Swiss-Prot record:
<keyword id="KW-0805">Transcription regulation</keyword>
<dbReference type="GO" id="GO:0006354">
    <property type="term" value="P:DNA-templated transcription elongation"/>
</dbReference>
<dbReference type="InterPro" id="IPR018151">
    <property type="entry name" value="TF_GreA/GreB_CS"/>
</dbReference>
<comment type="similarity">
    <text>Belongs to the GreA/GreB family.</text>
</comment>
<dbReference type="InterPro" id="IPR036953">
    <property type="entry name" value="GreA/GreB_C_sf"/>
</dbReference>
<dbReference type="GO" id="GO:0032784">
    <property type="term" value="P:regulation of DNA-templated transcription elongation"/>
</dbReference>
<feature type="coiled-coil region">
    <location>
        <begin position="41"/>
        <end position="62"/>
    </location>
</feature>
<keyword id="KW-0175">Coiled coil</keyword>
<protein>
    <recommendedName>
        <fullName>Transcription elongation factor GreA</fullName>
    </recommendedName>
</protein>
<dbReference type="GO" id="GO:0070063">
    <property type="term" value="F:RNA polymerase binding"/>
</dbReference>
<keyword id="KW-0238">DNA-binding</keyword>
<dbReference type="InterPro" id="IPR022691">
    <property type="entry name" value="Tscrpt_elong_fac_GreA/B_N"/>
</dbReference>
<dbReference type="InterPro" id="IPR028624">
    <property type="entry name" value="Tscrpt_elong_fac_GreA/B"/>
</dbReference>
<dbReference type="Pfam" id="PF03449">
    <property type="entry name" value="GreA_GreB_N"/>
</dbReference>
<comment type="function">
    <text>Necessary for efficient RNA polymerase transcription elongation past template-encoded arresting sites. The arresting sites in DNA have the property of trapping a certain fraction of elongating RNA polymerases that pass through, resulting in locked ternary complexes. Cleavage of the nascent transcript by cleavage factors such as GreA or GreB allows the resumption of elongation from the new 3'terminus. GreA releases sequences of 2 to 3 nucleotides.</text>
</comment>
<dbReference type="GO" id="GO:0003677">
    <property type="term" value="F:DNA binding"/>
</dbReference>
<dbReference type="InterPro" id="IPR001437">
    <property type="entry name" value="Tscrpt_elong_fac_GreA/B_C"/>
</dbReference>
C-alpha cells in the first residue's frame, strides 16, 4: 500500500471512531426516547447505520494492521507496484496515466489502478516502449507504455 493510501484509510478510521460512531450512538439514544422500539423507524435506521459503521471500522483496522507501506520514490526499473505509468491506447490514440496501487486504495476515476486488475497485471514487468494486449468486456485492447515513473 502506498503512504497516501494508508493515510487516507487511517483518516477514514479516525473519522468513523471520533465523529460517526458518537453521532450514531446519540441518534440511537434519541430514538429510544420516542418510546416503542418495535415500530420506531428512526431507531431501526440508526441501529442499521451503527452496524455499518462498526463493520467498516473492523474492516479498516484489519486492512491497516496487515498493510505494508511502500514508498514508490525508492523504486526504479520496470513497472511494479507503486509505479506511475502513462499508456497510449493504440486504437483511440488517447494517453492515460495511472498509479498501480493496492485493492483498498484503488480508484480508477482518480487514476489509482488496482494491482489485481487485468490492465495492471498486463503492465507489471513491462518497460517504456513495450506494447501490451488486454482482454476487456469490449474485446482486446492494445496499449503502449509511454512512460514509467516512481514518485
Amino acid at each position: 500500500m502506498t503512504r497516501a493510501g494508508f493515510t487516507a484509510l487511517d483518516d477514514e478510521l479516525k473519522t468513523l471512531k471520533t465523529v460517526e460512531r458518537p453521532a450514531v450512538i446519540r441518534s440511537i439514544a434519541e430514538a429510544r426516547e420516542h418510546g416503542d422500539l418495535s415500530e420506531n423507524a428512526e431507531y431501526h435506521a440508526a441501529r442499521e447505520k451503527q452496524s455499518f459503521i462498526e463493520g467498516r471500522i473492523k474492516e479498516l483496522e484489519a486492512i491497516l494492521s496487515l498493510a505494508e507501506v511502500i514508498d514508490p520514490a525508492k523504486l526504479s526499473g520496470s513497472i511494479k507496484f507503486g509505479a506511475t505509468v502513462t499508456i497510449l491506447d493504440e486504437e483511440t490514440e488517447e494517453e492515460r496515466t495511472y498509479q498501480i496501487v493496492g485493492e483498498a486504495e484503488a480508484d480508477i476515476e482518480a487514476g489509482l489502478l488496482n494491482i489485481k486488475s487485468p490492465l495492471a497485471r498486463a503492465l507489471i514487468g513491462k518497460d517504456e516502449g513495450d506494447s501490451i494486449e488486454v482482454k476487456t468486456p469490449g474485446g482486446e485492447r492494445g496499449y503502449e507504455v509511454v512512460s514509467v515513473r516512481f514518485v
